[in-house]
Amino acid sequence: MRITGIIAEYNPLHNGHIYQLQQARQQSQADLVIVCMSGNYVQRGQAALLDKWTRAELALQNGADMVVELPFVSAVQPADRFATGAVQLLAALGCQTIAFGSEQPTFDYQQAGQQIIDLPEQSAAFVDYQKTYATQLNEFYQEQLSLQIDQPNHLLGISYAVANARLAQPLNLLAIKREQAQHGDQTVSTAPYASASAIRQVVTQGTALAALQHVVPAGTLAALADSTLLTEDQLWPLLKYRIESLSLAQLRQVYQMSEGLEYRFKKVIHKANSYTELLQALKTKRYTYARLQRVCLYVLLNIQPADIQQGLQRTYIRLLGFNEIGQQHLHQLKKTTDLPIISKVSAKMGAETGLLGLEVRVDRLCEQFGWQSQNFARQPIFYHGKDEAHC
């Protein structure tokens, strides 16, 4: 069986994602397409607009055969760590190919990944505080390999390639040309494709959802209209309270709170009247907005280095949904994988020290804002066919 994996957030799922699912299956001649999808929090440190179960069902409705959750410890990380967790999970699921969108589909990612892992380790030398880590890494790659990585999906593709090259048995890499809208585009035009960030902006600004009907499937439009959406504005009062109430010593214990960043948080928090104002006040040449957003989320959820270290050691496969073809693969996977396959969360699993302890803890925040239980009493979605799915 030919199995192709896709790494995604679907925040939210739109026409560009459907195109990628179709092209991944077609170009790799896949019998099965598995999506490794971020849970309720995404790579840039934000809560997803829609919960993971809704997004998984939308993926199944639009071409995925199986959807598994990328754990928080990998999902809310810089590109290299995000890629490592996702690629390793897809390899464990039996994928032979990883498909991803790229602005440079003819680029040889396979070769670049191998070249990069053969380079000497340089990250410790990136100490220019007038530049972000990503900028310094890009300059290093350009100097050593003449690689110019100035587009977000190209950077992610390189990260996938490096993580893949480190596998004992690397997978095939399939870069699919992005259609029209680029990652980060902030406008929705009359074209059938728009970036996820442009779509989120329409939703969060209160614009009529009818403006999106030509760029998202009907299921996404209905979910956005019917679901309880979780935005930064809703989380802001709680984040402000957390920053103001924690001492410097306590802030210093937060994951990725380094280089004296805790002092900056304390200095600017009293002047900030919104999440956006806080980020603008925190921003320096050293930190990207994505890095600051992740740290804010770590503060909000009280994520400490030990949480991440323990989470990375608790490897498992968390099923969110599958169709009949995915179910057939699941039966075979149970015979071959050493990883626990989780379809139901028991009280023991969900305890603080349990296999899914961290996921249960971070998802509780979403549940406080009206989302249904995200772990207990939930079963994987079995998608039978068009417009029919059962949990």
From Swiss-Prot:
It is found in: Cytoplasm. GO terms for molecular function: ATP binding; ligase activity, forming carbon-nitrogen bonds; tRNA binding. GO terms for cellular component: cytoplasm. It catalyses: cytidine(34) in elongator tRNA(Met) + acetate + ATP = N(4)-acetylcytidine(34) in elongator tRNA(Met) + AMP + diphosphate. Catalyzes the formation of N(4)-acetylcytidine (ac(4)C) at the wobble position of elongator tRNA(Met), using acetate and ATP as substrates. First activates an acetate ion to form acetyladenylate (Ac-AMP) and then transfers the acetyl group to tRNA to form ac(4)C34. It is an enzyme of class 6 (ligase). Its EC number is 6.3.4.-. Pfam families: HIGH_NTase1 (PF05636). One of its GO terms (biological process) is tRNA modification. Keywords: ATP-binding, Cytoplasm, Ligase, Nucleotide-binding, RNA-binding, tRNA processing, tRNA-binding. This is tRNA(Met) cytidine acetate ligase. ATP binds at residues 7-20, 101, 153, 178. SUPFAM superfamilies: Nucleotidylyl transferase. Belongs to the TmcAL family.
